[in-house]
Amino acid sequence: MNEPVLFLLLLLALGFLAKNKSLIVAIVVLLAIKLVGLDQKVLPIIQSKGINWGVTVITIAVLAPIASGEIGFRQLVGSLQSLSAWVALASGIFVALIAKNGVTLLANDPHMTAALAFGTILAVSLFHGVAVGPLIGAGIAYTVIKMVEYF
């Protein structure tokens, strides 16, 4: 058994122990790709485009209530009358700006990707986190690195 499969099986066990369906599904899909022999063709595409696909799917999910008519201009204007909505608005802007720098860091430093991926795997499997961490984590890492370089 090769190292990637063994590593994935170990992570699959963690996924089952943590009862994390997203992690389990992701690993089963990756193992299936390897099992049928498409890994050389498919995995590089997933690796290079997967984050963008994921962001697109999340964006679709966030915009679905607008498309369904559940959220309209009235709800938007009404929500901006509360302090909580303004905090959410500022948080959304802040996180999007942080994540932008994360894309830059992941593209320029492949070694960072391994550490961030492992941190995300630990958070997802052990603490029931959600796997949006690598992009935000990379953005935070980028910001901290730039601050350290500045001083």
Curated annotation (Swiss-Prot):
It is found in: Cell membrane. Keywords: Cell membrane, Membrane, Transmembrane, Transmembrane helix. GO terms for cellular component: plasma membrane. Belongs to the UPF0756 family. InterPro entries: UPF0756_TM. It comes from the Bacteria. It holds the Pfam family DUF441. This is UPF0756 membrane protein GK2737. It is a multi-pass membrane protein. The chain crosses the membrane at residues 5-25, 53-73, 79-99, 121-141.
